[in-house]
């Protein structure tokens, strides 16, 4: 089946490394390799855009400050004006459990700085940057605030957070819901065996602490997977599991065939012979990396073998229990059949 061969002949990344930054819970570089040439750019750009636009997070959508009617006011004894206070509030990093909207309260008395850690958030909201300074009070000044917190994604301007029945003094705020602050990626060449034109994707992610970089990338990949599902308009071909018993064997009977029967090209056949691979059962337990380390064995030979194995419901990198059987030669003769 041509469709089957197209997607199964491509190499897939076999490892995902996480290189922590100076704040591991917020900053890390996710490294995926090996990828087919061009896939580093394709996946890196797609995941980056999803990370910045589509992850759900929590943000303050409105604030009410005692004695303040609108955001262009100033508060006696508070060094910052309301506009500056609102800008500081927008920097709050929150993790909310459950649905919104929810409320947070703040009561403070001067002198000194008022920080996010003084907010009474309740058990279902976590403040990830408690050291954030919201404003500075003079001696004896009292300040009270009430925050409205909601869940969302992306960026929502203050105009959309304004409710028609809002009480006087409730100031809507631009909501930056995304827990991801910065994303960058780069693609470097990597090698597998003797082949050097594969891609290595390095995705550097910085979050606000509400989600780890690794989890944010996992969520973005899941979103991408879900969006692409609609485009798959065929059923995946049924593959015979190698661990299903056939003819009282604990593995796929095709494993007992010799690789000479695969009708491979002379180059591929010689590479298998030089590597002492006699049966298909020996071959499928080799990984792609192991095969590519075989002298004179390149990507063309790898793809050829993967296509042939896929047509039998097999693949490289399989784990076969009970292999090799003690009477392998007798079994091979008894089950010998033409393809």
UniProtKB/Swiss-Prot annotation:
Region (Alpha N-terminal domain (alpha-NTD)): 1-235
GO BP: any one term: DNA-templated transcription
Keyword list, A-Z: DNA-directed RNA polymerase, Nucleotidyltransferase, Transcription, Transferase
EC main group: transferase
Catalytic activity field: RNA(n) + a ribonucleoside 5'-triphosphate = RNA(n+1) + diphosphate
Gene Ontology CC: cytoplasm; DNA-directed RNA polymerase complex
EC annotation from Swiss-Prot or TrEMBL: 2.7.7.6
Keyword Chaperone annotated: no
GO terms, molecular function: DNA binding; DNA-directed RNA polymerase activity; protein dimerization activity
Chain spans, region Alpha C-terminal domain (alpha-CTD): 251-339
Reported function: DNA-dependent RNA polymerase catalyzes the transcription of DNA into RNA using the four ribonucleoside triphosphates as substrates.
Domain notes: The N-terminal domain is essential for RNAP assembly and basal transcription, whereas the C-terminal domain is involved in interaction with transcriptional regulators and with upstream promoter elements.
Stated family: Belongs to the RNA polymerase alpha chain family.
Record note on quaternary structure: Homodimer. The RNAP catalytic core consists of 2 alpha, 1 beta, 1 beta' and 1 omega subunit. When a sigma factor is associated with the core the holoenzyme is formed, which can initiate transcription.
Protein's UniProt name: DNA-directed RNA polymerase subunit alpha
Organism (species): Granulibacter bethesdensis (strain ATCC BAA-1260 / CGDNIH1)
Name of the gene this protein is made from: rpoA
